């Protein structure tokens, strides 16, 4: 009996110590040699243009690839079904496509940390009766198949049994919003951020009742073999959150689109079609190092592209220059469109060059525009004030908070240059950013319709007035 027990125990120990052969490829993930990111096209997700790639998800993906020290490969898909299948088949490493957290996605995938929040809203067009709720509709809802909107409608149908909708697979969210504006469909559902961005180009869009509130936008990872990537993503997310990157990207893509003026947006789109062609070449010629569309957007904010514009304060012309500024940069006739554009471009380029190198390239234009509006000295006051409040003086998102304080005695009495209408400067910059985004969209649409047209190189042919010739204390 003793020998039998000994043999049994020995056999068990030998078995326990024996190396088990497994297919390691099934359990151990291969080291990434590149980060393959599946995505969808959209202005807040991923877009390509002559000015480079952009989008909240794209910018974060670039940073994540840098964090992992591997090349980034963006892999766009035309619909969600293909995107999901690609992730399940290990053709991509993750999905970064502006997708919200939903019960169905939690069951199928691993969800990354929250990037930002959105509401789901019912969308209709200007001129239709405003629906009070989902049961008060005068037409049919059309949504994208396999989207979170289908999940929302399915839940609502439990309370509204007569609720029906159409699902389509060959369109994306942007196309459905365009179909609303063009009266091709009655209603759709969209994320609030998408509506805010797209109504700059489609001003007839209207947001109706909120169907789901404060949904987290997340990245999707495979349900298995993604432990290492998830841990790296969480560490990266914590790093970027502490660094203020998420706040910066939220401000970059969404901070200037919340304010919306229906009449102004329609008027701007008409002006792009009817007025801008007369002056486009001048903007391209004199932009210098600027994107000519930013210069044109600034001019529209200043004068609505009216070369004879005047104000009660004495500023005049396409770029609304003051007499001292015009004299200093050699502009003799502020009401001459070309002279005014040349002078305004010179001033803006000068402001950009004067800014401290610590301000990131992507944000220098917004600081320069604020200087163009209220003067460089007041912007410097605001930067110092931001620093004293433990905010980042080199981040536009923080300067936006501080500039309005220059109107309050409690704060401006501590500054070198005193009172300034800082809230006006914030509104000024945000308006130009909205005009610029709209102009870029219209310009890109035109290039798609006329691909044989080459972009103009005139901007590089005639240099702007040399930088460093303007007084930093004065606004334009």
Curated annotation (Swiss-Prot):
Pfam families: SBP_bac_3, SLT. GO terms for molecular function: peptidoglycan lytic transglycosylase activity. GO terms for cellular component: cell outer membrane. Its EC number is 4.2.2.n1. One of its GO terms (biological process) is peptidoglycan catabolic process. PROSITE patterns: PROKAR_LIPOPROTEIN. Residues 451-460 have a biased composition (Acidic residues). Gene3D superfamilies: 1.10.530.10, Periplasmic binding protein-like II. It catalyses: Exolytic cleavage of the (1->4)-beta-glycosidic linkage between N-acetylmuramic acid (MurNAc) and N-acetylglucosamine (GlcNAc) residues in peptidoglycan, from either the reducing or the non-reducing ends of the peptidoglycan chains, with concomitant formation of a 1,6-anhydrobond in the MurNAc residue. InterPro entries: Lysozyme-like_dom_sf, MltF, Solute-binding_3/MltF_N, Transglycosylase_SLT_dom_1. NCBIfam families: PRK10859.1. Murein-degrading enzyme that degrades murein glycan strands and insoluble, high-molecular weight murein sacculi, with the concomitant formation of a 1,6-anhydromuramoyl product. Lytic transglycosylases (LTs) play an integral role in the metabolism of the peptidoglycan (PG) sacculus. Their lytic action creates space within the PG sacculus to allow for its expansion as well as for the insertion of various structures such as secretion systems and flagella. This is Membrane-bound lytic murein transglycosylase F. It comes from Shewanella baltica (strain OS155 / ATCC BAA-1091).
């Amino acid at each position: 009996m003793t020998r039998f027990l000994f043999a049994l125990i020995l056999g068990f120990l030998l078995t326990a110590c024996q190396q088990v052969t497994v297919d390691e490829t099934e359990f151990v993930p291969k080291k990434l040699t590149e980060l393959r990111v599946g995505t969808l096209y959209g202005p807040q997700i991923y877009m390509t243009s002559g000015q480079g790639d952009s989008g909240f998800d794209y910018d974060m993906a670039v940073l994540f690839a840098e964090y992992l020290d591997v090349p980034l490969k963006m892999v766009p898909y035309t619909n969600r079904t293909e995107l999901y299948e690609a992730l399940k088949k290990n053709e991509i490493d993750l999905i970064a496509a502006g997708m919200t957290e939903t019960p169905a996605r939690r069951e199928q995938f691993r969800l990354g940390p929250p990037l930002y929040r959105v509401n789901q809203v019912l969308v209709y067009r200007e001129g239709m009766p405003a629906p009070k709720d989902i049961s008060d509709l005068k037409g049919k809802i059309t949504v994208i198949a396999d989207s979170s909107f289908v999940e929302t409608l399915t839940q609502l149908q439990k309370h509204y049994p007569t609720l029906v909708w159409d699902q389509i697979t060959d369109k994306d969210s942007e196309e459905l919003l365009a179909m609303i504006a063009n009266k091709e469909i009655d209603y759709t559902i969209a994320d609030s951020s998408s509506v805010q961005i797209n109504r700059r180009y489609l001003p007839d869009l209207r947001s109706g009742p909120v169907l789901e509130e404060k949904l987290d936008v997340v990245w999707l990872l495979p349900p298995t073999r993604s432990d290492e990537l998830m841990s790296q993503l969480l560490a990266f997310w914590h790093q970027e959150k502490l660094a203020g990157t998420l706040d910066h990207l939220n401000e970059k893509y969404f901070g200037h689109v919340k304010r919306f003026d229906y009449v102004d947006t329609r008027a701007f789109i008409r002006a792009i079609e009817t007025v801008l062609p007369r002056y486009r070449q001048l903007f391209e010629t004199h932009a210098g190092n600027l994107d000519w569309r930013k210069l044109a957007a600034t001019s529209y904010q200043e004068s609505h592209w009216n070369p004879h514009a005047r104000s009660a304060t004495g500023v005049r012309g396409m770029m609304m220059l003051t007499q001292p500024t015009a004299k200093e940069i050699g502009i003799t006739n502020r009401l001459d469109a070309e002279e005014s554009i040349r002078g305004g471009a010179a001033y803006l380029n000068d402001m950009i060059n004067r800014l401290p190198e610590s301000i990131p390239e992507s944000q220098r234009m917004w600081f320069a525009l604020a200087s163009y509006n209220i003067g460089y000295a007041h912007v410097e006051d605001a930067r110092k004030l931001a620093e004293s409040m433990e905010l980042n003086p080199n981040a536009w998102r923080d300067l936006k908070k501080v500039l309005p304080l220059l109107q309050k005695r409690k704060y401006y009495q501590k500054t070198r240059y005193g009172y300034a209408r800082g809230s006006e400067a914030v509104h000024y910059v945000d308006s130009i950013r909205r005009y610029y985004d709209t102009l870029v969209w219209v310009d890109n649409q035109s290039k798609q319709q006329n691909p044989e047209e080459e972009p103009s190189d005139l901007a590089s042919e005639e240099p702007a007035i040399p930088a460093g010739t303007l007084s930093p204390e004065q606004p334009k």
